Amino acid sequence: MKLLQAVHLTAGWDEKYPARDMGNGKIRSVGMAMAMQGSGITCVDVGSATLKLNDEGIYTLSISSADMGTGCDTILAQIAAEVLMCPLENISVIAADTDATPYDSGSYASSTTYVTVEKTALGLITKIKAFGANMLKCSIDDVDFDGKSVINMHTNESVSLNDIAVSSMCGATQSLQHTESNSMPSSPPPFMAGMVEIELDKE
């Protein structure tokens, strides 16, 4: 409704509708159209991502969305880096290889970005905190993660991300990686409106 009101005011609709007689056999009139495009369609569109902590303390982000000019490889890496509190160069992206990367229903419009990678990064942080807490011999509730270390908030003892990475890979315990998928419970409705003014020769 706000979009239609904005078009209505910008176009001077009230002064031009339904038509103005130009006095030379011609009239001027206006028309308006509105459309909606499906994006993040419920029960159809799904995005998935996997983040893995490697033994050198950097991350691999695996996605199946193809960068067709949207910049999604960079954008999704930036989102992961922001959540994980690390430099962008610490995120290595493997993209659009559906034999190796988690399922994604496609890259189009701007619906590729945001939700899944954030969820994946937050899930990986939880696993990093749990692993770090185990190394510090305390509860996960006692620790925090600052992007470089897991810190016991009560004793200020810490274990570095690099040590966690090496221990998880080489200590016969577990590889630290996390996968998430996201699909919208309802479709967000991207919409657009436009107005045209025409001059018509009635004859």
Can you name each region flagged by the protein language model?
Residues 1-84, 96-203:
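Cofactor-centric catalytic regions
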